[in-house]
Amino acid sequence: MLHIERFQCNMLSENCYVVSDETKECVIIDCGAFYPEERKAITDYITGNNFNPIHLLVTHGHLDHNFGNDTIYQAFGLKPEVAQADEHLMKNLQHQAESFYQMKIDTVFPPIGHFFEDGETIHFGNHELSIIPTPGHSKGSVTFYCEAEGVAFTGDTLFQNSIGRTDFQ
């Protein structure tokens, strides 16, 4: 059975998920942790539960879903995995900070570790996540779907009580 721990992060209340099962393997989805206490809460949760994080998954390349990638890389050696259509966004996270948030950040983001392939499935523990392309919010937006549990991680493709925004492409 999946265990899903949600962390609300940064000034936009972005959702980061640590998804684990009984094997203690876990994946981190959309680590948008900006503030030090958010970063600490996520890493403490993973280490405190003796989890073995094996993937840092990204639904899309907007900064609010990637603020904390450097922390995950430093703590666990994981590089972000993303759709290639969002490569440009991922390589320009500092620019997003300046243009969207009017802030200058000196974060050194880890390089992209893997681009998703068409039809790829992410395996961890006793579970798997299908990668479903859902372009619209960004060209490379994806949804991670666990069919066995009936759970989807949609990033900003869907908002609570609404559809996601599609005007950022």
Please provide the spans of the model-predicted regions.
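Structured loop/turn residues at beta-strand edges in well-structured enzyme cores
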Residues: L2, F51, G125-H127
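Active-site HxH/HxHxD metal-binding segment of metal-dependent hydrolases
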Residues: A33-R39, T43-H123
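Metallo-beta-lactamase
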Residues: A33-F34, Q96-A97, T121, H127-Q169
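Short, function-defining helix-loop hinge/capping sites that tune catalysis or transport
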Residues: C16, E38, G68, K91, ...
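Divalent metal-coordination and catalytic microenvironments
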Residues: V19, D30, H60, I72, ...
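Short, basic and Ser/Thr-rich N-terminal targeting/leader segments
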Residues: L12-S13, F109, G125, S138
